[in-house]
């Protein structure tokens, strides 16, 4: 490991899979068959390597099925908004305006820190940017623009320690 200073370890990916034994209720059905634990994080530290947890925030096609209140909706329906047609493999996303979705990501960040991760690398901290977004319903925005909402979330996540955003 000579010359290696950081190791990025996937904790949650853009497919919604969790790579450790999370205690967060919304994560229970999405835990990967391959996981790591706090001992693995400790081994990195003992080797002089800073562990960095990689967590994909709102691009998550699985968690909406666990808690529908966390999802972006299609127009004024209870259906999920999908990032493509269903027959073309379209997937739902978590809604950044949803307090449930925000709490879910916050809980995963807190768990990563509790496992010993010193830094968090966040990906997918965004609203969907693809065609068809005009049909997306984000619900109550609290009067915040999309940019303001993401900034608000990041401020909270960064208050607990180093968070980097891709």
Where are these regions (language model features)?
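Substrate-binding cleft and catalytic face of glycoside hydrolase catalytic domains
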Residues: 14, 43-67
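Catalytic domains of carbohydrate-active enzymes, especially glycoside hydrolases
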Residues: 2-17, 111-123
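N-terminal structural segment of carbohydrate-active enzymes
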Residues: 1-9, 49, 99-102
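Active-site-adjacent "subsite" loops/lids of carbohydrate-active enzymes
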Residues: 58-110
